[in-house]
Amino acid sequence: MQNCYTLRPDRGKNVTYLIRATFWYGNYDGKNQTPTFDLYIDVNYWATVSSPIYFYEEITYVSQADDIQVCLVNTGNGVPFISALELRPLDDDISPSGLRFLQLHWRYDIGRSLNYSLRYPDDVYDRIWEAKNYKKWIILNTTSAIDLSVNDDEYKYKIPGEVLRTAQGPMNASSPLELWWLSIGQNKWIVYFYFVEIERLTRGQQREFTISMNDNQFRETVSLEYLKPVVVVSTPVNGWNITFSIESTNKSGKPPILNAVEFYTIGDLPNVPTAQDDVKAINDIKAMYHIKRESWQGDPCVPSKYTWDGLTCSYGNPPRIILA
């Protein structure tokens, strides 16, 4: 059984959105037993929800139809619930070409004081930036205004200036910045690195470094200018975990820094929605005859185990309703 929320943004299909589902159980039902259930975006699996504390699942998603369905699927381990559901339009070029479903794992404002987060109105996309300090790194910051008038190709990401005013670097100037995270399973990762030179260097000095990830599956060299943002988006990187190193080049007179970072995995979209003409027709029938069957939520045919009661579907590309 599934319960679905239908989002109808004005911009319609083939548009990039941030979608965030927030959950806070709080023992609202008095059972003191956190339910476990699945979350679907349109006709594809998004995540499994199981947490007694406040948390959220967030994706960057390119809409496949005029409507977007977010469904809570009962898997027999308690009644699904949701505390908030948000949708924000993004620049269509913010995701690497061809990637329609990115699932956020971490988004960090590096060098910021702990117990601090930043979102709208500072971030026009309403991304939530969590403060992160690494004890083995030194903190750098500036009160100067970040130059956000860089070219459109860089600034489609619209990262807030406040996020870029802090950074961290290595304790030892000759050491790289190194981090690793362990994943639950084999994934394809995309990482967004954000940099700004926030230290006024002396004439002739330069901060240049090379980013490498997962045994050089991705590698890129970056040179910074004072107060001008640089965004580096990795190519897809495979692995059970993710490691990266940011190391100064031989001609750099300064150690590497990192201002902010986002980690995503590439989501799978194996299922194709039911033909839109069929969906419109069956929803018109549903409205005309005031049909209130419990199963008539979400996509009529897909996933096949949640096909609406009373319908027969064919499973070509796309699936079609052949009997109602």
Give the role of each language-model region.
Residues M1-S314, R320-A324:
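Compositionally biased, intrinsically disordered or flexible polar/acidic segments
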